[in-house]
């Protein structure tokens, strides 16, 4: 079970990825992972797959307006992978855990089992109250996550769809 992408455990995280990459079938439990440091997620999947794995989406910085990662005009390349990687997802899988799932969409032989994720890819959000309506909203002070046109595999507040939807409590047993 991987609950947080914490940079202080980067070495242990990378060691676990290397160990899992040698197994024919591995399972990464992200059901209670609320996010963390994005670089840890990228390093984990790259270490697991022994290659660079690309995300389909792109992060766009709102202050100042600029792309954090350049959008590709061509199709995102798939990363080959001979082993099976099962990722467990749930409603608490958020932020950086969702980035890991996005990366896994481009990794051969990966399978996401569980529930839709949290749908919170906006980075560094803050709670504000609108002055006239007094409605409470969360807004990002950093970046938003954009998916390719026509793509419906992720949406803010709805999350990522798993490949196989099962109740999160049962995902590990049914995997």
What do these predicted ranges mean?
Residues 1-9:
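STAS-typified acidic loop motif
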Residues 30-31, 55-61, 113-116:
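Surface-exposed patches in mature extracellular/periplasmic domains of secreted proteins
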Residues 21-26, 51-54, 80-85, 107-111:
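Loop/turn elements at helix/coil->beta-strand transitions in domains of secreted/extracellular proteins
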Residues 84-106, 111-120:
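Extended C-terminal subregions enriched in glycine
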Residues 1, 19-36, 86-88:
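Short acidic catalytic loops
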Residues 35-84, 122-134, 141-145, 156-157:
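Gly/Ser/Thr-rich loop/hinge elements
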Residues 10-17, 41-45, 85, 97-101, ...:
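Extracytoplasmic/secreted envelope proteins and their assembly/folding machinery
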Residues 112-172:
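BRCT (BRCA1 C-terminal) domain core and associated BRCT-interaction motifs
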